[in-house]
Amino acid sequence: MKILGIETSCDETGVAIYDEDKGLVANQLYSQIEMHADYGGVVPELASRDHIRKTLPLIQEALKEANLTASDIDGVAYTAGPGLVGALLVGSTIARSLAYAWNVPALGVHHMEGHLLAPMLEENAPEFPFVALLVSGGHTQLVDVKNVGEYELLGESIDDAAGEAFDKTAKLLGLDYPGGAALAKLAESGTPNRFTFPRPMTDRPGLDFSFSGLKTFAANTINANLNEKGELEQQTRCDIAYAFQQAVIETLIIKCRRALQQTGYKRLVIAGGVSANKQLRHDLAELMKQIGGEVFYPRPQFCTDNGAMIAYAGFLRLKNGEQTDLSVSVKPRWPMVELCPIDV
């Protein structure tokens, strides 16, 4: 069974092909970062237009990379939500049109289930059950994962996602969009303990997150440390970046520890764009070492949005007999707990 996967939920156009026998045989990705950088964030209309321009050429490239033709494809999976409605509609329309033309089934995949299952593409894949930390620009969630589709939401951000807080704070520090990776780089030269940021919602029970206050705290810290010219010294920028990053990471770790204690699991999966953060990976590895558990990640290129995770998640469900009718419909908001469980 060979599945074509299409990802167009935000500002990356991803196309991949997953082969049941060979694994991932093609992976193509186009990022719109340069285009949106001029605006300091994703412009939905521009994102949709660019997906229209890029998706079909990437599909052709993926088929070429895998040395396949359209007649070899057994199903088409696409991101149906959550995400930007216009961007989702582009991928959905193209996927359904191809599925109809090729006379194969189509399936709308949940974007965050794709992220959650991305570590399954690695040689050292986790076994069920496990706790998943899904941490990106749009989501910060802790999920009890018993099997594919058998999910219980343990906690989530009540305001800004962790990745969103990274990008907003990076902008306050004068870094270009997207600022998460740039802030992490700046933090490498930071001085520990010069600034102390709060660890939001860690002083109370529960597994929910809140990161909007950290951005406000960062803004106040920046304003309080401007020099006579109204500028931040470079070392001060590094120190603020360090303090902010540590606050986010320690908050995530505290909540992960609680989730593992609550479930009794010894396996932790971390996925989503922020999971590429080196310091977060290091500190979570230390946590799991302390409790005698294991932590699993996707490779860095599969931390951000990509077609590979959609092709794989789609393969699992299409193989199980699921498919979506030919009507073009997307779900900009879509709780993952609504998904049906399947046996794998």
Swiss-Prot record:
SUPFAM superfamilies: Actin-like ATPase domain. It is found in: Cytoplasm. It holds the Pfam family TsaD. Substrate binds at residues 134-138, 167, 180, 277. Gene3D superfamilies: 3.30.420.40. PANTHER family: TRNA N6-ADENOSINE THREONYLCARBAMOYLTRANSFERASE, TRNA N6-ADENOSINE THREONYLCARBAMOYLTRANSFERASE, MITOCHONDRIAL. This is tRNA N6-adenosine threonylcarbamoyltransferase. It comes from Glaesserella parasuis serovar 5 (strain SH0165) (Haemophilus parasuis).
